[in-house]
A protein has these predicted regions:
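Short hydrophobic/aromatic patch on the recognition helix
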Residues: 37-47
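C-terminal peripheral helix-coil segments that are non-catalytic and often amphipathic
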Residues: 91, 129, 133-141, 156-192
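Basic, helix-initiating cap at the start of DNA-binding domains
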Residues: 1-22, 26-35, 52
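Amphipathic alpha-helical segments used for helix-helix packing
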Residues: 92-115
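Hydrophobic alpha-helical connector segments
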Residues: 56, 70-95
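Short amphipathic alpha-helical segment with a characteristic S/N-K-E followed by hydrophobic residues
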Residues: 26, 49-55, 64-65
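Amphipathic, non-transmembrane alpha-helical scaffold segments
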Residues: 54, 58, 62, 117-128
Length: 192
């Protein structure tokens, strides 16, 4: 009997669910194989270790985030880009939780893992530089305050993305609300 193939997106989706539910330390191929209804050896045909699979998953998500962020460069104002970027980051909010496991991964387990972790670090730095650049452009355009350092604004921006959506709002509505509070503040209209 031929081995069952695994669809890439199914493998990535189940990997994500297991990481979110069980954490990195409890993640293993047997559990993943059971969820995918395949033999463990089938997963080994694709990835030689959990480190390689998990970093491949992270690269896959980062590629999607980066592609969506790059598509926003066409927006006319830096403020609109910052708002739209927040929507992308909130849409993929699970990535922040999952990237917290990077220090647990043995980066020296294989050249592929080391390369993936290095790339993730570079991509994260690129996104941070993009946000910082947009902050500077928005200041120049008079869209945001220029009396606060961009590094502080960027930290507040990234912290706002991490606010848990306990009410389980649609990610678009949640992003809109968070950005509005971030941009307009908590003061009642006319009280600023």
């Amino acid at each position: 009997m031929a081995k069952r193939k695994i669809e890439f997106q199914d493998l990535m989706a189940e990997t994500e669910q297991l990481l979110l539910q069980k954490g990195y330390k409890a993640f293993h191929f047997k559990l993943l194989a059971d969820r995918l209804n395949v033999a463990r050896s089938t997963i080994y045909e694709y990835y030689s270790s959990k480190e390689e699979l998990v970093t491949a998953y992270m690269i896959n998500i980062m590629n999607r985030v980066t592609a969506e962020c790059e598509a926003l460069e066409q927006l006319s104002s830096p403020l609109e880009q910052l708002k739209a970027l927040m929507g992308v980051f909130i849409k993929y909010s699970q990535i922040h939780q999952i990237t917290q496991i990077i220090p647990q991964i043995n980066r020296n387990s294989s050249p592929a893992v080391k390369s993936s972790i290095d790339r993730l670090s570079e991509d994260h730095e690129k996104l941070y530089r993009t946000i910082m650049g947009l902050m500077e452009k928005a200041k120049t355009a008079g869209e945001i305050r220029s009396d606060v350092p961009s590094s502080v604004l960027a930290r507040v921006y990234f912290t706002a993305i991490e606010i848990p959506n306990d009410e389980e709002w649609d990610h678009r509505d949640w992003s809109e609300l968070i950005f509005r509070v971030l941009y307009e503040g908590m003061a009642a209209p006319g009280n600023v």
